[in-house]
Amino acid sequence: ITRRLDRFEDEMQFEYVRGFEDFVKNIREKGVKTAVVTSSNVMKMKNVYAKHPEFKGYFDEILTSEDFDESKPSPDCYLKAAKRFGLTSDECVVLEDSFNGLKSGRAAKMFVVGFATTNSHEAIEPYSDTVVDDYTGLSYEGIMRSLGQ
């Protein structure tokens, strides 16, 4: 089973959600620190890097399952990311598509943008401050407005 799972992950394409690259470039130009906080392990992330060598360059930090004691939906992973940047929860924004990730961001008391990429708007709305289909239309300015800044 493990070999089949490894082969499946090796063959995954890890396609970006529409608008991702433009969005992350936009917020980084504004000086926003960025992190990936994933329940995936280092080996799975190596598959992502193999398919998208530029991926690491989009982020200041990449935290994998090896970096935290409790997995999502515990807030631990997001709180550790905030701590690495010297930030408080109210200074952070979580972008998530999974139920456990959304719950984790909520439990960390961060602003949560839910992506309706694998689940419906209605399903993730209770766990999100706002729901979007993809990164198209998301911007630094729009998020700052949502935060009241």
Where do the model's predicted regions map?
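Short, basic/glycine-rich phosphate-binding loops at helix/coil junctions
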Residues: 1-6, 59-62
